[in-house]
UniProtKB/Swiss-Prot annotation:
It catalyses: Ca(2+)(in) + ATP + H2O = Ca(2+)(out) + ADP + phosphate + H(+). It comes from Gallus gallus. It is a multi-pass membrane protein. SUPFAM superfamilies: Calcium ATPase, transduction domain A, Calcium ATPase, transmembrane domain M, HAD-like, Metal cation-transporting ATPase, ATP-binding domain N. This is Sarcoplasmic/endoplasmic reticulum calcium ATPase 3. Inhibited by sarcolipin (SLN), phospholamban (PLN) and myoregulin (MRLN). Enhanced by DWORF; DWORF increases activity by displacing sarcolipin (SLN), phospholamban (PLN) and myoregulin (MRLN). InterPro entries: ATPase_P-typ_cation-transptr_C, ATPase_P-typ_cation-transptr_N, ATPase_P-typ_cyto_dom_N, ATPase_P-typ_P_site, ATPase_P-typ_TM_dom_sf, ATPase_P-typ_transduc_dom_A_sf, HAD-like_sf, HAD_sf. Keywords: ATP-binding, Calcium, Calcium transport, Endoplasmic reticulum, Ion transport, Magnesium, Membrane, Metal-binding, Nucleotide-binding, Phosphoprotein, Sarcoplasmic reticulum, Translocase, Transmembrane, Transmembrane helix, Transport. Ca(2+) 2 binds at residues 304-305, 307, 309, 796, 800. The chain crosses the membrane at residues 49-69, 90-110, 254-273, 296-313, 758-777, 788-808, 829-851, 898-917, 931-949, 965-985.
Length: 999
């Protein structure tokens, strides 16, 4: 039923045709169950194992590799002689890589906690209903509850459906609905209609929402929504409809895959077509078909060479290392690709409570009466330091510390704060912090009493556990609390009846201590306390007090104020009707005003500097809160989102103001806004959508079930460590310390990771370009194979993979947070950089072909044939006069491929050294700045020696050990790549960086 909160209860009962006293008939229950379905959230439809496996092969490069493996397998059947066994190595290795990749992908998806499944944890198993088929209240399974059911809830119960309250059967009804609204304080409910049909959930004080908990009291209500129609069900539907967005890196790699696949296809076709004239060469036995197959194999080798097989593993490893570094900074990353996405975050939408603020209410101002003379009066004003629950801080008057025991008014104020209170402080020894036990507001008063220490209690020798409530305990030993008159909406206050302890004391010394909303309490005051005297409360004095409270409430801090008062001669406790809350207001009359305290949820100390850092980094911070607009704007000014004098028109909106705008106006509002107050979860999702329409990369924080859809929709969903399981499951990152500054540290880490990732992606791609150039050159020039597919796989996966991974440890730039967020559409490799790595790649290709050719032409241990003979090696027969005196088998020697492979590996190690910095010379940024890289290079070379010198590896990789003179040639051919890249870096620094800055 829509807007059930805005109509009288009788209208809701009539709508469902039910009487409060007897409930639904069995026939009505059956009809409603058929109409609305069971009261449960449907389980998530999970993909089958087969679907998950197939998904791992949707990547274009993976498909090309799969095709290459399939073709290699078929071609291996046609091999003859010694090659018939080694021919199977290549397809087997490729298939093993693909299987390993698929297993990891499936395992990650299977183990991902589902936010939708986590929602089901909030469903209660049982509910208490009144139905016509049985007298009294009966317990039934919660899934069997239907709309129209009359339900009873009491303290400790989990609400089984969305319920409109009919009647509250206790003094008050408090509900903890933090999972749904994010509010940390329990909410006091009532049964009266809410006149606003468009009220947000926080304002629907006559509604109970499915999955929330009854903190105190008892009530009866009528079910108005079940299952997917409840507020929590709507959140589930939003999450189902939210398609996860690909991260900028995933999009880049997809684009790269598509471009690379087109290039591979064209180059493979070109190599095959160019060599059609060689299909009938004698080396193929004169068979055109065998020649075609041979060059087809070359094309497959080219495809294998062009694909950076090690890239997915290296990226995963780099991101995993990044997550470890982030975890040390209290940011737990749940989705690896999001590590990189953090680097291009341009907007951070942050909750106020607990993220920008401490979520630890603290009293920062208080006043008592100084003197009252006729119509004139003055106040003693105090400020209090310390912004957490730790009982540490000073009471200051005119910026100077004071001893509270000197002021009689402060002694009485502390007494009221300690006794008119059901909360306490607790020292958590494992976390080493003080925590609240009970309501945040009351805990702030408890903490104030500890800071005031009005009886000068010696706390120096107490442990932190004993220190937590030491001063409160002293006061509680002097006065005994007899009963509590709980808070109620009509009087907006609560009070306690206390009697002095110890012998000789009787009820004659009893007092009633009251705390509550200032207007309500002061209205019932007839006197004010000045020292120990009681002075009549005149209209001018009343106005002075209320004026001070208004200043605190409406000023820059927008403090939450509580008035504290005493009844010096309350009625006898025995005559009080404690079961009837309507009588409480009669007992709380003729009060004496003692003082007032102003409290707030203070901003975290480090937040202001973090927001300034965001401003320098070009990141816009938007505060999104369920709090009222005045408080939200005040906090924004305190932490630097707004300046002190900035006009917030068009920059701060309430949820209602935002809804009243047209869709286009809403979109434009999101472009400028920095504060949204009194918002609901649906607003968060809409804000993310509008920001994404401007190509903003958005990080969104949240902790409640209600935040899950927005967390899922944003590029970076950030859940609080203290948040719900649903929010954590929907998020990419969890802040274990709930601190905004941790987000900024994570963004900084994300930027550093992206810079390092660019370095190793370029490093790997320049290697692949070199391999492609090598195979292309040998095919075009008609030279023997310089590198075979299994060798290419070894280089791409192992020898290149280790240094590439180590490049992830490159130190970040010092000015990394002084730059604007990078454009997510900025290509990984563009313009000059593309030319640079193409130049390096061409050198790699020429060097590998040159090394193989050197062995044929000049090596003392080689055949020393002419270049013409080498180019026509396929025509080599005993009868061909060109090859007179040449043994044709030498063209199948393993030495040239070993030379080429050794040059490729050595050049790549030099190339890794070049990648320590994109533009800085090795003389300015030496390799030992990244000790991991030096270790990786040593390891890669050791593995290369392993396949050359340890049997049976030479047979598998079709290589052979090299002599020392051959190694000298390898080094001579390889080392110039350092000089080449140094020259290109010099051009970058001195000629191109300035031009890019001008752009």
């Amino acid at each position: 039923m829509e807007a059930a909160h805005s109509v009288p209860v009788q209208d809701v009962l009539s709508r469902f045709g039910v009487a409060e006293s007897c409930g639904l008939s069995p026939e009505q229950v059956r009809r409603n169950r058929e109409k609305y379905g069971p009261n449960e959230l449907p389980a998530e439809e999970r993909k089958s194992l087969w679907e998950l496996v197939l998904e791992q092969f949707e990547d274009l490069l993976v498909r090309i590799l799969l095709m290459a493996a399939f073709l290699s397998f078929i071609l291996a059947w046609f091999e003859e002689g010694e090659e018939s066994t080694t021919a199977f190595v290549e397809p087997i290795v490729i298939i093993m890589i693909l299987i390993a990749n698929a297993v990891v992908g499936v395992w990650q998806e299977r183990n991902a906690e589902s936010a939708i499944e986590a929602l089901k944890e909030y469903e209660p198993e049982m509910g208490k209903v009144i139905r016509a088929d049985r007298s009294g209240v009966q317990r039934i399974r919660a899934r069997d509850i239907v709309p129209g059911d009359i339900v009873e809830v009491a303290v400790g119960d989990k609400v089984p459906a969305d319920i409109r309250i009919i009647e509250i059967r206790s003094t008050t009804l408090r509900v903890d609905q933090s999972i749904l609204t994010g509010e940390s304080m329990s909410v006091i409910k009532h049964a009266d209609p809410i006149p606003d049909p468009r009220a947000v959930n926080q304002d629907k004080k006559n509604m109970l929402f499915s999955g929330t908990n009854i903190a105190a009291g008892k009530a009866v209500g009528i079910v108005i929504a079940t299952g997917v129609y409840t507020e929590i069900g709507k959140i589930r539907n939003q999450m189902v409809e939210t398609e996860p967005e690909k991260t900028p890196l995933q999009q880049k790699l997809d684009e790269f895959s598509q471009q690379l696949s087109k290039v591979i296809f064209l180059v493979c076709i070109a190599v095959w077509v160019i060599n059609i004239s060689h299909f009938s060469d004698p080396v193929h036995g004169g068979s055109w078909f065998r020649g075609a197959i041979y060059y087809f194999k070359t094309s497959v080798a080219l495809a294998v060479a062009a694909i950076p097989e090690g890239l997915p593993a290296v990226i995963t490893t780099c991101l995993a290392l990044g997550t470890r570094r982030m975890a040390k900074k209290n940011a737990i990353v749940r989705s690896l690709p999001s590590v990189e996405t953090l680097g291009c975050t341009s907007v951070i939408c942050s909750d106020k409570t607990g993220t920008l603020t401490t979520n630890q209410m603290s009293v920062c101002r208080m006043f008592i009466m100084e003197k009252v003379e006729g119509t004139q009066c003055s106040l003693h004003e105090f400020s209090i330091t310390g912004s957490t629950y730790a009982p540490e801080g000073q009471i200051l008057k005119d910026e100077k510390p004071v001893r509270c025991g000197q002021y009689d008014g402060l002694v009485e104020l502390a007494t009221i704060c300690a006794l008119c209170n059901d909360s306490s402080l607790d020292y958590n020894e494992s976390k080493k912090v003080y925590e609240k036990v009970g309501e945040a507001t009351e805990t702030a008063l408890t903490c104030l009493v500890e800071k005031m220490n009005v009886f000068d209690t010696d706390t120096s020798k107490l442990s932190k556990v004993e220190r937590a409530n030491a001063c409160n305990s002293v006061i509680k030993h002097l006065m005994r609390k007899e009963c509590t008159l709980e808070f109620s909406r009509d009087r907006k206050s609560m009070s306690v009846y206390c009697t002095p302890t110890g012998p000789g004391h009787n009820s004659a010394g009893s007092k009633m201590f009251v705390k509550g909303a200032p207007e309500s309490v002061i209205e019932r005051c007839t006197h004010v306390r000045v020292g120990t005297a009681k002075v009549p409360l005149t209209p001018p004095v009343r106005e002075k007090i209320l004026s001070q409270i208004r200043d605190w409430g409406m000023g820059t801090d927008t403090l939450r104020c509580l008035a504290l008062a005493t009844h010096d001669a309350p009625v006898q406790r025995e005559t009080m009707q404690l079961h009837d809350s309507t009588t409480f207001t009669h007992y709380e009359t003729n009060l004496t005003f003692v003082g007032c305290v102003g409290m707030l949820d203070p901003p975290r100390k480090e937040v202001t500097s973090s927001i300034e850092m965001c401003r320098k980094a070009g990141i816009r911070v938007i505060m999104i809160t369920g709090d009222n607009k005045g408080t939200a704007v005040a906090i924004c000014r305190r932490i630097g989102i707004f300046t002190e004098s900035e006009d917030v028109a068009g920059k701060a909106y309430t949820g209602r103001e935002f809804d009243e705008l047209s869709p286009e106006a809403q979109r434009q509002a999101c472009r400028e806004a920095r504060c949204f107050a009194r918002v609901e979860p649906a607003h968060k999702s809409r804000i993310v959508e509008y920001l994404q329409s401007f190509n903003e990369i958005t990080a969104m924080t949240g902790d409640g079930v209600n935040d899950a859809p927005a967390l899922k929709k944003a590029e970076i969903g950030i859940a609080m460590g203290s948040g719900t399981a649903v929010a954590k499951s929907a998020a990419e990152m969890v802040l274990s310390d709930d601190n905004f500054s941790t987000i900024v540290s994570a963004v900084e880490e994300g930027r550093a990771i992206y810079n390092n990732m660019k370095q190793f992606i370029r490093y790997l791609i320049s290697s692949n370009v070199g391999e492609v150039v090598c195979i292309f050159l040998t095919a075009i020039l008609g030279l023997p194979e310089a590198l075979i597919p299994v060798q290419l796989l070894w280089v791409n996966l192992v020898t290149d993979g280790l240094p590439a991974t180590a490049l992830g440890f490159n130190p970040p730039d010092l000015d990394i947070m002084d730059k604007l967020p990078r454009n997510p559409k900025e290509p990984l490799i563009s313009g000059w950089l593309f030319f640079r790595y193409l130049a390096i790649g061409v050198y790699v290709g020429l060097a590998t072909v040159g090394a193989a050719t050197w062995w044929f032409l000049y090596d003392a241990e080689g055949p020393q044939v002419s270049f013409h003979q080498l180019r026509n090696f396929m025509r080599c027969t005993e009868d061909n006069p060109i090859f007179e005196g040449v043994n044709c088998e030498i063209f199948e020697s393993r030495y040239p491929t070993t030379m080429a492979l050794s040059v490729l590996v050595t050049i790549e190690m030099c190339n890794a050294l070049n990648s320590v910095s994109e533009n800085q010379s090795l003389l300015r940024m030496p390799p030992w700045l990244n000790i991991w890289l030096l270790g990786a290079i040593v390891m890669s070379m050791a593995l290369h020696f392993f396949i050359l010198y340890v049997k049976p590896m030479p047979l598998i990789f079709q290589v052979t050990p090299l002599s020392w003179p051959q190694w000298v040639v390898v080094l001579k051919i390889s080392l110039p790549v350092i000089l080449l890249d140094e020259g290109l870096k010099y051009l970058s620094r001195n000629h191109l960086e300035g031009e890019e800055d001008k752009k």
